[in-house]
C-alpha cells in the first residue's frame, strides 16, 4: 500500500503553505538552479521544459517573480559554482506506508544518514532503491484553491479536460487535476489563463493505492516522519 490518506495529502498543502513558505522558496530556488544547468544553461522556460515546470511550482506557492528571475540570473552567472545532485530515497513509514523522498544535495554523506535517522526515529524503515517506487505513478498534479466554495465543479472539470488533463477530483475546498507529465506545462498555462489559483503544481509521484492509519501511534509517527523529512534542507519532496 502506498499512501495513508489521499485528501490528507492535499489538505495538508493548505495548512503548511504559510508556515513553510520561506523554506519552500529556498528549496525551489535550488530546483531552479538545477533546472537551468540541466537544461543546457537555458534560462528561458519556453526552451527549457524542466525550468517551466519548476516555475509553475514556484508560482503555486506565491514565490515572487523577482525571486524567480533573480535565481535564474544567479544560475546563469559565470561565478555560480553550486552543484546539486538529485538523489531519491525509498522506504516504509509506520503502518507500512510507502514513502519516496526526493533530495537535491551537495553532499550525499550528509543527506543519507539524516534521511535514515528520520525513518528510524519514527518507527519506519529506509529501504533499497526501487522497494516502493513500483507502487507509484509519475503524474502532473495541480491542486486548485476553492476555499470560498465559489468555483463550479463541472466548469472546472471541463476546463481541465479541455486543457489536456487526464483526471479530475474535487473535495470541498480543493480540486485536484492530474495529467501526464508531458502535458503538465500546457495544462498549467491553460488553467492559469482561465484565472484559477493553485495551491500546488508539480510533477508528483502518486500512490496507486491508499491505506488508512487507524493506530494513533502510527498516525503521530507518520506525521513526525513527514515533518522531519520536509524540514531537512536537502529534501525537496516527500511522496506518500
Predicted regions located by residue number:
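Positively charged, low-complexity, intrinsically disordered RNA-binding extensions
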Residues: 141-240
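N-terminal cationic and glycine-rich segments that engage phosphates or anionic surfaces
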Residues: 1-127, 132-141, 240
Amino acid at each position: 500500500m502506498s499512501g495513508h490518506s489521499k485528501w490528507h495529502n492535499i489538505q495538508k498543502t493548505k495548512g503548511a503553505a504559510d508556515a513553510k513558505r520561506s523554506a519552500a522558496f529556498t528549496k525551489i530556488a535550488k530546483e531552479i538552479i538545477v533546472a537551468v544547468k540541466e537544461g543546457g544553461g537555458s534560462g528561458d522556460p519556453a526552451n527549457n521544459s524542466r525550468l517551466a515546470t519548476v516555475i509553475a511550482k514556484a508560482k503555486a506557492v506565491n514565490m515572487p517573480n523577482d525571486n524567480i528571475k533573480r535565481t535564474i540570473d544567479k544560475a546563469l552567472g559565470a561565478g555560480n559554482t553550486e552543484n546539486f545532485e538529485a538523489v531519491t530515497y525509498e522506504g516504509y513509514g509506520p503502518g507500512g506506508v510507502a514513502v519516496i523522498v526526493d533530495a537535491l544535495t551537495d553532499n550525499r554523506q550528509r543527506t543519507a544518514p539524516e534521511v535514515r535517522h528520520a525513518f528510524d526515529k519514527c518507527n519506519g524503515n529506509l529501504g533499497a532503491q526501487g522497494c516502493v517506487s513500483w507502487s507509484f505513478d509519475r503524474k502532473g498534479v495541480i491542486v486548485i484553491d476553492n476555499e470560498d466554495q465559489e468555483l463550479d465543479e463541472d466548469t472546472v472539470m471541463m476546463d481541465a479536460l479541455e486543457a489536456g488533463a487526464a483526471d479530475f477530483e474535487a473535495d470541498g475546498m480543493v480540486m485536484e487535476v492530474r495529467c501526464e507529465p508531458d502535458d503538465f506545462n500546457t495544462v498549467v498555462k491553460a488553467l492559469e489563463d482561465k484565472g484559477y489559483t493553485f495551491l500546488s503544481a508539480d510533477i508528483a509521484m502518486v500512490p496507486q493505492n491508499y491505506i488508512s492509519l487507524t493506530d494513533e501511534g502510527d498516525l503521530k509517527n507518520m506525521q513526525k516522519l513527514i515533518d522531519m523529512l520536509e524540514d531537512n534542507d536537502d529534501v525537496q519532496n516527500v511522496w506518500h
